[in-house]
Regions:
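Surface segments flanking catalytic/ligand-binding clefts of nucleic-acid enzymes
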Residues: 155, 159-325
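Short gly/ser-rich loop at a beta-strand->alpha-helix junction or flexible surface loop bordering the NTP-binding
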Residues: 1-176, 195, 299-325
């Protein structure tokens, strides 16, 4: 029996249209599926009886959607390199005229009036990250809070920029984009994560007189980097570190990332900087506990000798509108 053609980047998957172009008859395709492979989606053939991994499922979805389609939504974000908190459910694609919207299983094809721009990422055409993020939000693939977190992550990692994201938002209706807009505001105020945005909001509301800077580079007089605290209070020489096990656990190569995170806090002490660690859970559920600890640290720092340091690339947060406490 004939072997399936090995098409680059398709990982053993072939569309029946490609097989017909290669000279396969309908009966030959049917015999192959019955005897050796299987069809994960209509018009798509896989040459083994094993299940597909996530990457193969995306490729299969694209083969079903057609060569004029482009991946968008959650799986589009993953293809661009974003790590999502939850595995996307839908494989979502966009197509332009004369194609139509259609759905099968968890694969959805959405019709748009203009052909989408795309990049080929690992064999699959993918819309720009900003468009994928908007479709992810407006398609209700995640909650507004999750979209907010993904937006901040995309900006913080440099996968997009505020200008590009604002331009993309300006080309679409505002409904369904609240999480994106919130994340954009958070990032422009200096936050690199949702917990940091919560910290900024707490301090701006409850301790509005404190001068603070988000994610500044602190260097000593010789220009050597001391660290990049999540939040720095320069008048009191206090570094606030939001320590999340979710984001800092695990290994990078042979290095324990959590141990490195904790050890890094010790670098501030010789420079007269007090470190106040706080967890995202405390910021979210017990802000008063955090504020009591902060007040104690501020009091302890009064009158302590100051060591010369320099602040680089500090972001001054925009004052938040007042809220009722």
């Amino acid at each position: 029996m004939r072997e399936l053609p090995d098409i680059e980047d398709q990982r053993g998957l072939v569309s029946t249209s490609q097989l017909r172009t290669a000279g396969w008859s309908r009966s030959a395709i049917s015999r192959f599926v019955r005897s050796r492979g299987w069809s994960p989606l209509p018009g798509v053939v896989y040459g083994h009886r094993t299940t597909l991994d996530d990457d193969q499922r995306v490729i299969a979805g694209w083969l079903w959607a057609g060569p004029a389609s482009a991946l968008t939504g959650g799986w589009g974000l993953v293809r661009h390199g974003l790590v999502l908190a939850a595995r996307p459910v839908l494989r979502r694609f966009v197509v332009a005229d004369p194609c139509h919207s259609r759905v099968v299983d968890d694969v959805e094809v959405l019709h748009v009036h203009h052909a989408p721009t795309f990049r080929n990422l690992s064999g699959v055409p993918v819309v720009p990250l900003d468009r994928a993020l908007i479709d992810y939000a407006r398609g209700f693939e995640a909650t507004a809070d999750s979209v907010r977190a993904v937006t901040i992550r995309a900006l913080q990692t440099g996968l997009t920029s505020p200008a590009r994201l604002e331009a993309a938002l300006g080309e679409t209706r505002p409904n369904g984009t609240r999480g994106i807009r919130s994340g954009l505001i958070d990032f422009e105020r200096g936050a690199w994560s949702v917990p940091e945005a919560q910290l900024l909001r707490i301090l701006s509301r409850r301790r509005p007189r404190l001068k603070l800077q988000m994610n500044p580079r602190l260097v000593d007089t010789s220009g050597r980097l001391i660290g990049v605290p999540d939040c720095y209070l320069p008048d009191h020489r206090v570094a606030i570190q939001v320590h999340s096990w979710t984001h800092h656990a695990g290994f990078h190569g042979a290095r324990d990332q959590w141990a490195d995170t904790v050890d890094a806090d010790a670098r501030y002490i010789p420079h007269g900087i007090a470190v106040l660690p706080v967890s995202p859970t405390v910021l979210r559920d017990h802000p008063e506990r955090f504020l009591r600890l902060l007040d104690g640290v501020l009091l302890a720092q009064q009158g302590r000798a100051k060591v010369d340091i320099r602040i680089e690339v500090a972001v001054e947060p925009t004052p938040l509108a007042p809220h009722a406490s």
